[in-house]
């Protein structure tokens, strides 16, 4: 009976794999300028006021570049952040390493910091994008780190693997990957703002206690209410 049930589950998943949910290129309608640079699938949102000094790099969840990422990026741009989104689903569809990702990202930062004449960089990640964020920052060269003002992690899990897994997309995998997010966060010295939805079942990093780590809550579950976007933005607007 168990074998038959497992076979039915596998058959169902295989049949679902043909739908958009399980395809690499998952991008919804958006308001960005879409491009690919330094191996990174990016989405550009110019700041409302060009004279701003703030540059935001936003790593999406493994669901792709969809409505949440687009809506939040638009709001950041309206609040005078030059915003560059990265489609984590596309980029991490193939296995990466923290070193490789940091190498690609620092080239992107250098190019757009020069183009936009910004010297204040902020790193934001949602879900899978939040999981990999501390590893990437810790691999940046010292010169690049000096310009990163803060990290913001939205609904991170406890482990990650620098690759999108089918089981995660199907919501059938366990949070047991080789890269331990909490241990990497503890190495960080710059301000880190972490948020979870009030109704999320697991808040993997809620037990971390260190001076530079601030944890907060947002209305909603793993998908927040639209009214909470201002709260996400406000913590970075205050730094420095």
Model-derived segments and spans:
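C-terminal catalytic histidine-bearing segment of alpha/beta-hydrolase fold enzymes
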Residues: 214-240
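Conserved hydrolase catalytic core segment
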Residues: 136-148
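Conserved acidic catalytic loop of the alpha/beta-hydrolase fold
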Residues: 104-119
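Short, surface-exposed "cap/lid" segments of acyl-processing enzymes
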Residues: 34-81, 85-88
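Active-site nucleophile loop of the alpha/beta-hydrolase fold
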Residues: 151-164
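C-terminal motif of bacterial Sec signal peptides marking the signal peptidase cleavage site
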Residues: 17-18
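The feature captures the conserved acid-bearing segment of alpha/beta-hydrolase catalytic domains
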Residues: 163-211
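Gly/Ala-rich beta-loop-alpha elbow adjacent to hydrolase catalytic centers
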Residues: 124-133
